[in-house]
């Protein structure tokens, strides 16, 4: 997973606008983790904040629990991170969506820390207040979006696992009307 806020400015030009600029990666089979140490060292030597994880699902879901709700709510409201987190209603929606993802991920065997939702909200607050998600920018520009990845997937997973995800259903329905 990658934690960064960036946008395509033109052909061959990507502008980083904020975020921690971190890269998390790992093998599918945790027994292979040591084979990836040279890649981690190479990235770190190049000045990239890279972290190798023996449990590749944990960093993947850690990014998902953060970016899915932020992408959904910023796209729905048209507000950047700072305004979403500063609005009590929007913040409650983001937090509720994070809790829905936590329930689905735990059912799938992801071993989140107990404070994953609060940590994810803190991660969002660390971004520049004017930060927009790539999905929000895609909606603004009329481009194809990541709605299926960030929101529809949770609706489907919740249904398959018997876990209620009413907030994801609501956001999905509203964004589908755009």
Task: Label each PLM-derived region with a short phrase.
Residues 1-13:
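Rossmann-like NAD(P)(H) cofactor-binding subdomain of soluble oxidoreductases
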Residues 13-63, 68-115:
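Internal alpha-helical scaffold of NAD(P)-dependent oxidoreductase catalytic cores
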Residues 34, 44-45, 83, 93-178:
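NAD(P)-dependent Rossmann-like dehydrogenase/reductase catalytic/cofactor-binding core
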Residues 7, 74, 149:
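Active-site-proximal flexible loops/turns
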């Amino acid at each position: 997973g990658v934690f960064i806020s960036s946008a395509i400015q033109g052909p061959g030009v990507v502008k980083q606008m904020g975020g921690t600029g971190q890269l998390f990666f790992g093998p599918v089979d945790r027994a292979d983790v040591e084979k990836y140490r040279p890649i981690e060292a190479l990235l770190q030597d190049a000045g990239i904040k890279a972290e190798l994880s023996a449990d590749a699902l944990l960093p993947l879901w850690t990014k998902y629990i953060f970016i899915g709700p932020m992408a959904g709510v910023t796209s729905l409201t048209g507000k950047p991170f700072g305004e979403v987190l500063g609005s009590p209603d929007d913040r409650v929606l983001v937090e509720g969506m994070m809790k829905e993802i936590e329930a689905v991920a735990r059912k799938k065997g992801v071993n989140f820390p107990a404070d994953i939702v609060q940590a994810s909200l803190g991660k969002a607050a660390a971004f520049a207040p004017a930060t927009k998600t790539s999905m929000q920018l895609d909606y603004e520009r009329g481009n194809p979006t990541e709605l299926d990845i960030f929101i529809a997937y949770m609706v489907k997973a919740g249904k398959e696992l018997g876990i209620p995800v009413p907030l994801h259903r609501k956001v999905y329905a509203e964004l589908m009307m755009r």
